[in-house]
Amino acid sequence: MIASLDLARFPLGIAEREALALRRAGRRSDAAFARLLLPMRLRSMPWPVPRLTLAYYFALWPDEAALGRFRGGPLARWDDARERLSLTLRPVRGFGSWGGADPLGGERSEGGAGPVALITHSRTRARDLPRFLVADGPVVRALEDAPGRLWSDGFVDDPARLDSGTLSLWRDTTAATAFAYAPGVHQSAVKAQRDGGWFSESWFARFAVEASAGSWRGVPFIL
């Protein structure tokens, strides 16, 4: 199994059209799991305050051939975007569920020495939303200042259900795990969530970045 994360920046008014077209095409693809992610500013999470010029697409594929067919077919329409970044990812490990199951199906692999991607997803219980918002602010600020963070952003999967998550790229596994597991505001928020049961489901996954093409925010992402 391999994974893909594709980011695109479009002129205002174009991103929604392109994203919806890709969602329809994705339903007919060989992807084992695919989500069109609605980019949201992390500081607004989980409220659906959209970033109207961006579109993100995350998927899991049985092999590189299946991913290649999708990127050479339906995803090629994103080639006209103002900016694009395509990442090919290898699942390292995942915990929890997204949509009722672990998208990785328990698959694991050894981490590498290069950049890594972290993806989180959660569905917040409405009654616990105020507590989540109070705890989330310091975590977002800590993430933005974390050593080794290359990029991060938020997304909403289903605004009506308060489904939200984060995407982040890191220099290496050491930097990513230091933020995720070291004592501090993030671990305090994780403990508070677990003790309070704020989420009806949540998922965390780490991926090794195997290949990249393009740039983001004007900076090439080079392995």
Locate each region found by the language model.
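Signature tryptophan residues that serve as conserved aromatic anchors
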Residues: 60-61, 170
